[in-house]
Amino acid sequence: MTQQHRRTVPWLARAVLAALLTVAAAVHADPIVLKTTELGHGPTIVIVHALGGTRNDWLPTARRLLAHYRVVLVELPGHGESPLPEPFSFAAVGEALDGVLAKQNPDSTIVVGHQFGGRAALAALAAHPGRAKGLVLLDVPLGLPMQMEDQRKKMFLDFMDNSYESVAKMMFSKLGRDTTQSAEIFTMFQQTSPATVKAFVREGFFTDGNKDAKSLKIPIQRVATSRLWKPELTSGAVLKTLGWDDTTSTVLRLPNSGLWAMKDQPDSLAAIIGQFAVARFAAAKK
């Protein structure tokens, strides 16, 4: 072996060792821990908020549930103090949420997911069946309402990267039940990191949540706000707008409500969740 080879071998060994250690560190990295707010006692309702929101958005509805339930409000990754998984995927978000679900009693737990919080819930329950007895989904998109070529998706996402403020305003400035509330929502939404928004939107464009939804063996209660469910639309048309393959499923309409449905209609929404929970827990005891 030449002198040059003797120098090269230790260098290669060190490089290989460093690479192996890097991979090992990634494999054994600490899981993402999501921040939660836990209130009350009794059977558990786990609630995951929407993109651009906070877990405290759900306090008005949570308070209506506290007489009979323990409520766990979960922070969506990339919001507040809960980090965004790297690399990002709904599967990774679901794994982070499962860290919360795994601590609950599966025989007395219902999960509520709002918008992309619903995609997180679907991913978690698809990967870990048996964590809950039922799922309530509020305005949850499973895919795009129409077929779009990957090239067009990429063009839109590139435009979002280059003109984030314009795209964010186009997508998220009309989510309220009226123009005044829409402006308030968008002001709050702008506090969310653009990296978080881009990650969720990109994943929403390129993944299909129907597979997760179809894999679940537990009942799903679908709920739509009146912002989405206009009077002239059928429930099937609403589900199609949200990208659902199954447009025959039952949907409950929440009147006079937008993205802040949990604030707009806390009594009605709590009643829907509570009635669903009662039915599911009763069925589980049979």
Please give the residue ranges for each predicted region.
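Conserved HGGG/HGGXW glycine-rich cap/lid loop of the alpha/beta-hydrolase fold
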Residues: I32, T37-P83
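Conserved alpha/beta-hydrolase catalytic His-Asp/Glu region
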Residues: M146-Q147, F159-K217
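Bacterial N-terminal signal peptides that target proteins for export
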Residues: T2-V16
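N-terminal signal peptide c-region/cleavage motif recognized by signal peptidases
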Residues: V23-A26
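Flexible "cap/lid" loop of the alpha/beta hydrolase fold
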Residues: L122, A126, K133-N162
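Conserved loop-alpha-helix segment in the C-terminal half of the alpha/beta-hydrolase fold
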Residues: I220-K263
